[in-house]
């Protein structure tokens, strides 16, 4: 018989980190813990307050329900938590963890065997120019070859100057640059800003305008000189038919898939 419980854990940022939605000081997460016949499994339900579609008053109640009904099995529980994507990914992790020889090794791969690293981007948080410039230097010194810069909260001209300073020293062959606007641009100004950004050999921009403006986003994706990646646009669209229709309307160059959010 499987037993389940959960724990809340608050992660504290070493440095308050800025996005166009505000300053982040803490990150709330929930751990789902399963046990059976002396074995255990752990899954993380990574809720993002203010962003996740399942940031709702009954979130903890749903976790309690999941724990009380864990014997229903993974497939039924996933169907019953379709509006709680962060709980779904926690469930998947927890069951895989329970079934694995090592609870913290869900899949055997070159990464888990310490044979190969996974390339990730170095995230540059928003802040004043000096703060962002210090982060850029630090990430490059750490060996990152792809930087993703949050934009949209400070003066656009300053952000452009930062991108220009990187490109002055590092070519596109040396450093890949991506930007994430988190929906900060107004539809009326977005295309012009994308044209300016495209001068700096960027890989792509995430979510230039707020989600929900399908026609405006579709027009941007059609006319943009800079590839667009949908991010927040995918949050809360649970029905497969609706997801397909949205992508057919917008026709983005890329999509960002975050298991805790979609």
Q: Model regions: which residues?
A:
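N-terminal capping/lid subdomain adjacent to the active-site entrance of alpha/beta enzymes
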Residues: 1-177, 182-184, 191, 195-198
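Catalytic core of soluble alpha/beta enzymes
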Residues: 154-262
